[in-house]
A protein has these predicted regions:
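Conserved glycine-rich beta-strand-loop-beta hairpin in the small C-terminal domain of fold type I
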Residues: 368-378, 388-401
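Short beta-strand(s) of the beta-wing in winged-helix/HTH DNA-binding folds
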Residues: 65, 303, 388, 421-422
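N-terminal basic, amphipathic alpha-helical segments
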Residues: 1-126, 336-342, 403, 409-417, ...
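Conserved core segment of the aminotransferase class I/II
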Residues: 298-368
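Conserved PLP-binding active-site segment of the aspartate aminotransferase-like
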Residues: 41, 323, 399-404, 422-460
Length: 463
């Protein structure tokens, strides 16, 4: 079997072997019993412990099963097209989240191109090419460019008072990949994951694909319902609580300081982890940035995902995860088998932007732009009768409650006929058909009032 493997004697050899075995199992090139550890090690001229570690990783991720006294066997692989399933399951795609034909786009929460710092990025890329030349295009460390991870650690210490080592930072291709990797590395079938209701569907789909049991706690004006969470914790053993504590998607709600502390206390008491998804805490409109859960975490209960690309340059797909020591190897293995590593050029350019302050300059500019857009949209929405909404202290969206007899799907269809994109509440919760999410991220300031007027007309017509 050794002729089918290309093992380089550098880097983490067991990860190379794991990745190649995984691929061959998925393509059904390997079936039945795997080659015994010692024999396989001799064939590949590597140590038996390396083969054993690769087999352990295959078992951990559900590709093989070990039979006492018999050997290691490939499990039956249920065929599925992940991308197709995502598209079919996600209301996001059904309701045209990525429709390029909207005249006024209130659906997308991605900033439009006028906000993106093109000149800063061009300078950074040119600097990196002059400094690193061919090195910028070589294979990168699967865990991420070392100096980017080092710069992230420095910023976490300076801005959040978080002490973390470089080895505990994993660079990923966007927050969604981070969620997927954590799901695959940390969660087993039938593990219980708690999510807020409503919440980001991409996270729900990720947990669902890993056959987890999903339970919900409702959102209140200051974050999740403590009473509902404690009720679950007293009767169930949960593995993970997924949350966006600052400017939550879709509600825009920020968890109160008291609830952040309470959640951390409950995680310690009931022995579960918190997955904090932070894409927007830098987009605050008050004087002070809200605290992250990770900055308050004294017992290493928070796995923190920070997305940079969301409000900087969406196409970069750049985020990082802070990883507890216990998960280091499994998360690195999942990243390696997913796409091996993130673009070295992108990582080096972004490290330069972080180091020289361009990121901070961009964020200050973005806060000013979006604060003004939020103000215009809020003042326009207040003119619509029989809806209710709160004004978030940051972020990119409003969560609007419709009149009781008006369906968000009907509003969506009506608005679509006028070339205006919104997202119906069912994208985020099956229970929220009388809510819509509208975002001011993508639309031009001059179009906000017109789009909101059309929304008001649609609601009035459907009442």
């Amino acid at each position: 079997m050794e002729k089918f493997f290309n093992i380089k004697k550098s880097g983490k050899i067991y990860l190379q072997l794991y990745s190649q075995l995984k691929e061959k199992i998925e393509k059904e090139k390997i079936k039945g019993k795997l080659t015994p550890v010692r024999k396989f090690a001799e064939e590949l001229e590597i140590s038996p412990s390396t083969v054993a570690k690769a087999y352990d990783e295959l078992e951990r991720n559900g590709y093989v099963t070990k039979k006492e006294g018999s050997g290691v066997y490939v499990k039956f692989q249920k065929k599925k097209n992940v991308y197709l399933e995502d598209h079919m399951e996600s209301e996001t795609f059904r309701y045209g989240y990525f429709n390029p034909e909207f005249n006024i786009d209130f659906a997308s929460a991605t900033p439009n191109e006028t906000v993106l710092p093109m000149e800063s990025l061009k300078r950074a890329i040119n600097f990196v090419l002059d400094r690193d030349r061919e090195s910028a295009f070589l294979y990168e460390d699967p865990q991420g460019y070392f100096y980017l991870r080092k710069t992230i650690c420095k910023k976490l210490k300076k801005e959040e008072n978080i002490d973390i080592e470089v080895k505990n930072i994993q660079i990923v291709s966007g927050a969604q990949q981070g969620i997927d990797i954590i799901s695959e590395a940390f969660l087993y079938p039938n593990d219980i994951v708690i999510v807020e209701d409503p919440t980001y569907r991409g996270a729900r789909n990720s947990f669902k694909k890993n056959d987890c049991k999903i339970m919900e706690v409702s959102m209140q004006k200051d974050g999740f319902s403590v009473r509902e969470l404690e009720k679950i914790l007293k009767r169930k053993k949960i593995k993970l609580f997924y949350t966006m504590p600052n400017f939550q998607n879709p509600t825009g709600i920020s968890m109160s300081f008291e609830k952040k502390i309470k959640l951390l206390e409950l995680a310690e008491k009931y022995d579960f982890y918190i997955l904090e998804d932070d894409g927007l805490s830098n987009l605050y409109f008050d004087k002070n940035k809200p605290e992250t859960l990770k900055s308050l975490d004294k017992n290493n209960r928070v796995i923190y995902i920070k997305s940079y690309s969301k409000i900087f340059m969406p196409g970069l797909r750049l985020a990082y995860i802070t990883i507890p020591d216990i998960l280091l190897d499994t998360i690195l293995a999942r990243k390696f088998s997913s796409d091996i590593y993130h673009s070295g050029l992108n990582q080096r350019a972004f490290q330069y932007l972080l180091e020289n302050g361009d990121w901070d300059i961009h964020m200050e500019k973005a806060r000013n732009i979006f604060k003004e857009k939020q103000k215009i949209m809020y003042n326009s929405l207040k003119k619509i009768k029989d809806i209710s909404l709160k004004k978030p202290k940051g972020g990119l969206c409003f969560w609007v409650k419709l009149p009781e007899n008006v369906s968000s799907k009907a509003v969506y269809i009506n608005m679509l006929s006028h070339g205006v994109g919104i997202l119906p509440g069912v994208v985020f919760s099956e229970k929220k058909d009388n809510y819509i999410r509208i975002s001011f991220a993508q639309c031009e300031e001059k179009n906000i009032e017109e789009g909101v007027k059309l929304l008001g007309c649609a609601i009035e017509k459907l009442k």
